[in-house]
Amino acid sequence: MAQEQPKNNEKSAEKTQTKPVIELLIPLEKYLAAGVHIGTHICTKFMEPFVYRVRNDGLYILDVRKIDERIRIAAKFLSRYEPSKIAAVSVRTYGQKPVVKFCNYVGCKPFTGRFMPGTFTNPSLKWYFEPDIVLLTDPRADSQALKEAAEIGIPIVSLADTDNRTEYIDLIIPANNKGRKSLALIYWLLARQILRERGLLPPDGDLPEPPSEFEVKFKR
């Protein structure tokens, strides 16, 4: 009796392996509504790995899953540091309230508005601060803080849009770092995730305020 041959459609020897899908920190729709994925019409070589696609009008779109992944990584990294030794910086107007709210929750030091030269490098200044790590909103706008952090050799975490160069940055968080809603959501998520990493919030815990409370409001 002839031995039965394996059927052609059998895949016993070659099983398809799929990577487990990690649930996003918030629903995809909330990321999209805040515009965190909206890039610019320019993309540097540094930011190419984080691009999802290019629209017909030439606008680069960031990959939301990579944004989410980097928020998790950055939160885990930042949570290892003494909060009072973390400097969070934003020269950009739309990033200033988010940075202050972030620091209120996390316990780190905010630097908003014009960054005074020598803040990290000149101990003789009355506003001198010696951080162990720096979180920047925009490598271009926050270039003075970036330069000084690199000079003293401390780790640098930074949000970066598609048009940013990222020399000296140790950990990039790809994101729209120009929009009000985007910056509010990113800093809200970072604060929440850091508190979760520290055990100050349960794994599914939320901040007592919504992301909209991190957003810059215009007076009418």
UniProtKB/Swiss-Prot annotation:
GO CC terms: small ribosomal subunit
Region (Disordered): 201-220
Signal peptide, first to last residue: none
A Gene Ontology biological process term: translation
Molecular-function annotations in GO: structural constituent of ribosome
Species assigned in the record: Staphylothermus marinus (strain ATCC 43588 / DSM 3639 / JCM 9404 / F1)
UniProt keyword list: Ribonucleoprotein, Ribosomal protein
Family from the record: Belongs to the universal ribosomal protein uS2 family.
Lineage, broadest ranks: Archaea, Thermoproteota, Thermoprotei, Desulfurococcales, Desulfurococcaceae
UniProt name for this protein: Small ribosomal subunit protein uS2
